[in-house]
Amino acid sequence: TVEQTFINENGKKETKSYVVNKDEGPRAGTSVEALAGLRPVFAADGSVTAGNSSQMSDGAAFVLIMSEEMVKELNLEPIARMVSYAASGVEPRIMGIGPVTAIPKALKQAGLKQDQIDLIELNEAFAAQSLAVVRELDLNPDIVNVNGGAIALGHPLGCTGAKLSVQLFDEMRLRNSKYGIVSMCVGTGQGAAGIFEFLK
C-alpha cells in the first residue's frame, strides 16, 4: 500500500492510499526470439534495441542533503554521509560510459579503493552501457544493481539520483554495508558518482 499526500487544486492537503498491484514493465508474450528480432534503434548495425533499453516510467524519491552543522542544530540522525562526489565527461558520441571516469575520480577524492565498496547502484539506461561500465572498471557484478537496474525497475527521468540513493541506502541497511556508490550516465557524455558511508 502506498500513501500519497499532496496539495490539491483548491490548496487543501489531501491524502490518498492505494495498492500497487501491477508492474507495467514486463510484456506478456515476450520471448528470446522476439527480443532477438528487434531492430537496433541508434545505428543499423548497433546492439541497442527496445528490448535491452530501460522503459520510461513514473517514479518518485526524496533525499534530504544537509551540512553536518545543520544536522547537529536540528538534532537529526542521518542515514548516510556523502563522502565524495565527482562529475566528469567523455566524448558525447560514446554517451553512457561517463561513470567510467566519474567513479575513479570519486574514489580518489574519498581516499578509497574499489574493493572497499560494498554496493553500487549504476543507472542502466541501456544494457550495453551498463555492461561497458562494469567491464571497463572491472566492477564485481555481484554488488552492482543487486535488486535490478532500470531495465527491470524502470527509469523515471529526473529522479535517477534520488531513486538510486534510496535503493542503495535500503540495501546497505539490510546488508550492514559501510560504503556504497551511486553513479549515472547523463546525456552528451557526462557521468556522475557519489560515494556514501552508511551511518545507521
What are the roles of these predicted feature ranges?
Residues 1, 76-87, 114-124, 143-149, ...:
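Beta-strand segments within the central parallel beta-sheet cores of soluble alpha/beta enzyme folds
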Residues 1-73, 136, 141-143:
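N-terminal extracellular/periplasmic Venus flytrap/periplasmic-binding protein-like
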Residues 4, 39-42, 86, 107-110, ...:
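Structural signal for hydrophobic packing residues in well-ordered secondary-structure cores
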Residues 4-11, 92-99, 124-142, 156-160, ...:
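Short glycine/threonine-rich loop-to-helix capping motif typified by GTGT followed
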Residues 45-61, 83-109, 118, 122-124, ...:
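Active-site pocket-shaping loop/turn-to-helix segments
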Residues 49-66, 161-200:
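Conserved beta-strand-centric core segments of catalytic alpha/beta enzyme folds
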Residues 70, 84-90, 123-128, 148-152, ...:
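Acidic, glycine-rich active-site loops and adjacent beta-strand->loop/helix elements
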Residues 71-75, 104-119, 137-138:
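Phosphate/pyrophosphate-binding loops at sites that engage ATP/ADP/AMP, CoA/4′-phosphopantetheine
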